[in-house]
């Protein structure tokens, strides 16, 4: 129902407009309080790059974070990542990730980023504390914050916004009547806009998600998607239909699609019942896999995806980031 309301297919949004106006007023006042100096933002001794979004729900932000970390690493930068750690509950914060930290503690996205990139990752509700914890343990050139565009308590040097190119901004209303955390006009003040799917507009950078080979959760074996038949596809992400569409575009034979809530907590029995027998493949997102690996069965597979930014815009973005990072580093010395 909420997707229908947010997409503009239902007029029931007007029932939620009073709450949306209140949400919009509060977010406006919070941002103004920092812009006018009534509240102080903490500035890191190293440059901060925010990768965020204007809307609730999955936009493909985490693949962009992974892409950015890997690209900057290839250029010789020492990169750290901080996150709110949504969906996790640690005994204390800030929490620095290592091989023994679970998604229950840190949340699924930070664990995924840590495993994919090998970059130092820290989580904390107050991102400034996460940044400080990283810098106390690691020598870094730049810190990327996964989400946090609206977290103005942390000063930032560069802002990237990721947009779902198919859904864009829905009906345009603030939460909860619409999907907006901030109005579309906020894009005028960010450094780059990356559009996941759809048709990019002027000054937007197109992006696609490219599927790799399916990987078995238990053995680590890789197989071509064409080798998996009659699969049960499951996704507990912000927008599950995107994952299912990726599978269909790759020609995967799907027997059933099962959508779960974002940051879903899974039980072994719950997932074991999804397949008819141990021979039928269960294919999930990589984000789900980091939560399910501990109790995986032989027929469970995940599909890693990589963000691919349009060229030459992708390279131009990296060049721009590198130039800005170098200038910011110089200004801090």
UniProtKB/Swiss-Prot annotation:
Q: Which residues form the signal peptide?
A: none
Q: Which InterPro entries match?
A: LpxK, P-loop_NTPase
Q: Which organism is it from?
A: Pectobacterium atrosepticum (strain SCRI 1043 / ATCC BAA-672) (Erwinia carotovora subsp. atroseptica)
* Residues binding ATP: 55-62
UniProt keyword Lipid biosynthesis present: yes
Which EC class does it fall in? transferase
GO cellular component entries = plasma membrane
GO BP, sorted A to Z? lipid A biosynthetic process; lipopolysaccharide core region biosynthetic process
Q: Which family does it belong to?
A: Belongs to the LpxK family.
| Name of the protein | Tetraacyldisaccharide 4'-kinase
- Metabolic or biological pathway: Glycolipid biosynthesis; lipid IV(A) biosynthesis; lipid IV(A) from (3R)-3-hydroxytetradecanoyl-[acyl-carrier-protein] and UDP-N-acetyl-alpha-D-glucosamine: step 6/6
Source organism, top-level taxon: Bacteria
- PANTHER family (alphabetical): TETRAACYLDISACCHARIDE 4'-KINASE (PTHR42724), TETRAACYLDISACCHARIDE 4'-KINASE, MITOCHONDRIAL-RELATED (PTHR42724:SF1)
Pfam family name, one:
LpxK
What does it do? Transfers the gamma-phosphate of ATP to the 4'-position of a tetraacyldisaccharide 1-phosphate intermediate (termed DS-1-P) to form tetraacyldisaccharide 1,4'-bis-phosphate (lipid IVA).
What chemistry does it catalyse, as a reaction equation?
a lipid A disaccharide + ATP = a lipid IVA + ADP + H(+)
Keywords, A to Z?
ATP-binding, Kinase, Lipid A biosynthesis, Lipid biosynthesis, Lipid metabolism, Nucleotide-binding, Transferase
According to its UniProt record, the EC number is 2.7.1.130
GO terms (molecular function) for this protein are:
ATP binding; tetraacyldisaccharide 4'-kinase activity
